[in-house]
Amino acid sequence: MKGKITIISAICAILFGGIQANAQFRNGASFADLDDSETVRALKEHVSTISAAVMEGRKAGSEGERMTAEYVTEVFGRYGLDVLSGKDGDIFGIRQESGDTLTSRNVIAFLQGGDKALRNRYIVIGARMDNLGSDTMTIDGRTVERTYYGANGNASGLAMMLELSRMLRTNRQLLGRSVLFVAFGASCQTFAGSWYFLNRAFSDVKEIDAMINLDMVGTGSSGFY
């Protein structure tokens, strides 16, 4: 959790200081005062909700992915952002080899920059919503179902994006460029949600100055999951 706070602070420094700013923070600083902070509590709540058993691993096109999109939409709205994708998300379809269509969605929220010369330039902050879902394997002749709940992949990135949106909304008067927050559907393996955003949903791609992708930020260098 301390690592998440450091990353959030660094990203805020870059956004408030401009694209070329360098974020600086002390090594070895004490984070004890952050243990019970509002941000830490919110991060834990987001991760717990998004990686809950009811989400069933959030496989692309699943009910769990849809419920995650609904949750992200609700939080963006509660935090005071303009949700551009509507209550159902920005829905798109993916044709499968079987001929069936997989239905997924992106969630897009917006904060307008305050600089008249820069507000039509954009920084995109994104995180994928979907994970691997579940599968079955045979152990000692017994079929066992495994669910990949995805606390790190990628509930951690979504949680950080949501809290960044809250912080930037609170301090929006310091923003020069506008910021787009995008929770990508069907992007764990095929990157379909990010492709759809760039090629179908957002027309001002040339006005994007930077993109920050938040993916699997929950463990640092200590592990993969």
Segments (PLM) and residue ranges:
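Bacterial Sec-dependent N-terminal signal peptides
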Residues: 1-26
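N-terminal hydrophobic or amphipathic helices/low-complexity stretches enriched
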Residues: 19-67, 72-82, 120-122
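Soluble non-cytosolic domains of exported or imported proteins
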Residues: 34-44, 59-70, 119, 142, ...
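Acidic/His- and Gly-rich active-site-bordering loop/insert found
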Residues: 50, 76, 97-139
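Short secondary-structure junction motifs
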Residues: 85-89, 120, 176-179, 209
